[in-house]
């Protein structure tokens, strides 16, 4: 059974510096070690987002491209919500190409959009 308190304390320290690299590391780790149902997955999402939305928010530009495709832990509406990611303005939406999500935004550079497309193909 998923122990919320235990999970919270185990990732609180790694998340304390509130950096994109810590977020990436934690998500990569969780993708390797956690197999759970959708309800538990949702709880994990909320806990991670809560920890990383404290103090200084994560800059979207610092997230690794591959982290955008770890949708088993993060859902796009949560990750892209301006409440949690404040580096870019609202108006982001997402589409699908080759069964993988791609983020589109008028606020992202053309180069970054190209990288996302390239990763998808």
From Swiss-Prot:
Compartment(s) where it occurs, according to its Swiss-Prot or TrEMBL record: Cytoplasm
Keyword Metal-binding carried by entry: no
UniProt keyword list: Cytoplasm
Keyword hit for Cytoplasm: yes
Tissues with expression: Specifically expressed in chronic lymphocytic leukemia (CLL) cells from patients without immunoglobulin heavy-chain hypermutations. Expression is detected in all CLL cells and levels are similar in patients before and after treatment.
A GO cellular component annotation in the UniProt record: cytoplasm
Lineage: superkingdom: Eukaryota
Extra information: Tridimensional modeling predicts that it may interact with the IL-4 receptor. This protein has no orthologs in other species and appears to be the product of a protein-coding gene which has arisen since divergence from chimp.
Protein name as catalogued: Chronic lymphocytic leukemia up-regulated protein 1
Organism whose genome encodes this protein: Homo sapiens
Recorded name of the encoding gene: CLLU1
């Amino acid at each position: 059974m998923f122990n919320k308190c235990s999970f919270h304390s185990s990732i609180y320290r790694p998340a304390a510096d509130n950096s994109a690299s810590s977020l990436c590391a934690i998500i990569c780790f969780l993708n390797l070690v956690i197999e759970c149902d959708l309800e538990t997955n949702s709880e994990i999402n909320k806990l991670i987002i809560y920890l990383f939305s404290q103090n200084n928010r994560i800059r979207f530009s610092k997230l690794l491209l591959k982290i955008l495709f770890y949708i088993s832990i993060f859902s796009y509406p949560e990750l892209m919500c301006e409440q949690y990611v404040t580096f870019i303005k609202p108006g982001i939406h997402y589409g699908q190409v080759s069964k993988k999500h791609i983020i589109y935004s008028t606020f992202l550079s053309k180069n970054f959009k190209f990288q996302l497309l390239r990763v998808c193909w």
